[in-house]
Curated annotation (Swiss-Prot):
Its EC number is 1.-.-.-. The active site is at 237 (proton donor). InterPro entries: NAD(P)-bd_dom_sf, PRISE-like_Rossmann-fold. This is Short chain dehydrogenase sirR. The gene is sirR. Glycans are attached at residues 67, 157, 274. Residues 1-28 form the signal peptide.
Length: 404
């Protein structure tokens, strides 16, 4: 007897995780090949703009708004052809409060996840596995200063206890994971909750929480304003400059999602799993290397930022106030190089400022993933450069020829 064909559904397909999942699912080889890959998005997107291939197995479904009620989302899912044949669901959607408020963002994401899983239960009757993407916020990293003794330093392990209220109310992944587990138990699905820290990669849209896209825009525009060979000081704090962290490239992350989902039938429910590229690094180590991609010279935080209580300070050539002074050049920049409009003018300064000032070590323990047999590793600088290659191809930043 032949086993039932594997069919994938990616919820949140145009984000930094979903975009790569599409490509990796199409590339997965036998015996874990997927006969179809259905991508769900809220806003319309073309295959060419997304840099997705023309492939008979690939289908894009737009207008799926997870912010609606469960009943409305179920109705939207019913309109997806062959939804009842889906076997593997990859939930990588992520909502964001317009003000970056943690509590409001948590509320949005919990509602989205519930609506999506209610729809899966109702119409995707052949589902075997739910691969949900969480993140390192479960370890309370953004709240470390306020948690005091309740914050447990890393390396962060999946066995660590949840942070207490009121901070737990700001971590949507707790309630999302609980709902995933409850629905999986109810429907005899296996499930995994994948926990990366920062994801390095490309997205065809100007995501407000994609570090490599935001940095790529900043670096490219900085090069345009100040010229080739300009010195670019790290715009974060001295403590953030030296803090250790782990990241993961979007392709490796996608392959880990696929690996855990296709091995669950034989290995059982994986549950929560940390993942990184296996390399512990710091801005001190990689900043000079990554800015070289743009022919810039990377330098430490400026001296005034390394003295006294200056952790929250910003570089004079970074942030919304600096950008306001050079805004006129942004339009010139896009026009001169024929770039997609409104990317540079919408750099996520608040998100960048937050990430570039995280002063605690945030290293993930990935032994559980290794024990499952996922042994991939990659280089952090190469992951950044790959994402910027995609941005050049998408005309979000100038090509090599234009930059010379």
């Amino acid at each position: 007897m032949h086993s039932k064909p594997q069919r994938a559904l990616v919820i949140g397909a145009t984000g930094v995780s979903g975009w790569s999942l599409c490509l990796q699912l199409l590339q997965t080889q036998t015996p874990s090949a997927f006969e179809s890959v259905d991508l769900l998005t809220n806003r319309p997107v073309s295959l060419s703009d997304a840099q997705w291939p023309t492939d008979s197995r690939l289908r894009v479904h737009s207008g799926i708004d997870l912010n609606r009620t469960s009943e409305e989302v179920i109705g939207s899912f019913r309109g997806i052809p062959d939804i009842g044949e889906i076997t593997h669901v990859f939930y990588v959607a992520c909502g964001m409060s317009p003000t970056y408020d943690f509590a409001e963002t948590a509320k949005i994401n919990v509602q989205m996840t519930k609506a999506a899983l209610d729809a899966i239960e109702a119409v995707a009757v052949c589902t075997k596995h739910i691969s949900f993407q969480a993140g390192s916020i479960v370890y309370g990293i953004p709240f470390a200063d306020w948690l005091g003794d309740n914050f447990r330093p890393g390396p962060f392990n999946e066995s660590f206890a949840r942070v207490p209220p009121p901070f737990s109310d700001m971590v949507s992944h707790y309630r999302q994971e609980d709902y995933v587990k409850a629905m999986a138990d109810k429907n005899s699905w296996t499930w995994s909750s994948i926990r990366p820290d920062t994801i390095i990669g490309f997205t065809p849209r100007n995501s407000p929480h994609c570090l490599s896209v935001s940095l790529g825009l900043y670096f490219a525009f900085y090069r345009y304003v100040y010229g080739k060979g300009a010195v670019l000081h790290f715009p974060g704090s001295e403590s953030a400059w030296k803090a250790d962290f782990t990241v993961i490239g979007q392709d490796q992350l996608a392959r880990f999602h696929i690996f855990t989902s296709t091995h669950a039938a034989s290995n059982g429910t994986p549950g929560a799993l940390n993942i990184s590229n296996g390399e512990t690094t710091s801005w001190e180590q990689i900043w000079p290397k990554i800015v070289q991609y743009f022919d810039l010279v990377g330098a430490p935080p400026e001296p005034k930022m390394a003295e006294g209580d200056s952790d929250d300070a910003s570089s004079p050539r970074f942030g919304p106030e600096w950008f306001q002074g050079v805004t006129a050049k942004a339009t010139e920049f896009e026009a001169e190089y024929g770039l997609q409009p409104d990317f540079v003018t919408n750099i996520a300064w608040q998100y960048l400022t937050f990430l570039l000032n995280l002063k605690i070590d945030r290293v993930l323990d990935i032994e559980k993933a290794r024990d499952l047999g996922f042994l991939e590793s990659s280089n952090t600088v190469s992951d950044f450069e790959k994402s910027w290659d995609h941005m050049r191809k998408a005309r979000i930043i100038p090509s090599v020829e234009q930059s010379d």
